[in-house]
Structures are given as C-alpha cells and as structure tokens.
C-alpha cells in the first residue's frame, strides 16, 4: 500500500491529493472494485475474451 509522509508546512488537502494520486497509480481502487463481488471463472474468461476481441478490432481499425 502506498504511503506518504506529510511534509512540514504542507496542508492536509495537498497531502490527501498526493495520497489519492499514489493509490490511483498503484491501482488499488480498481482492484478493490474488481474484488468487491465474487466473479465466476467462466464470467472472468468471457470478459477476458471480450476485452481481447475489442483490442483486436481497435488495432485492426487503427491499421487502416
């Protein structure tokens, strides 16, 4: 988990902003949302295949 040290004279708002940026960069919030509910392995496979298909279509469209 990312941690920050509050600098001397730094406001709480700016420290909170740095912390939010660090957690977003580490992908913690997206990981929490992903693990919030159980997802069956078959559903995971379908989502993964759909994402791969979208990437392929996007790549093919970009090459033209």
Swiss-Prot record:
Keywords: Ribonucleoprotein, Ribosomal protein
GO BP annotations listed: translation
Region of interest: Disordered: 39-64
NCBIfam families per record: S21p
Biased composition (Basic residues): 43-64
InterPro entries for this protein: Ribosomal_bS21, Ribosomal_bS21_CS, Ribosomal_bS21_sf
Family assignment from sequence similarity: Belongs to the bacterial ribosomal protein bS21 family.
The protein, known as: Small ribosomal subunit protein bS21
GO cellular component term, pick one: ribonucleoprotein complex
One Gene Ontology molecular-function label: structural constituent of ribosome
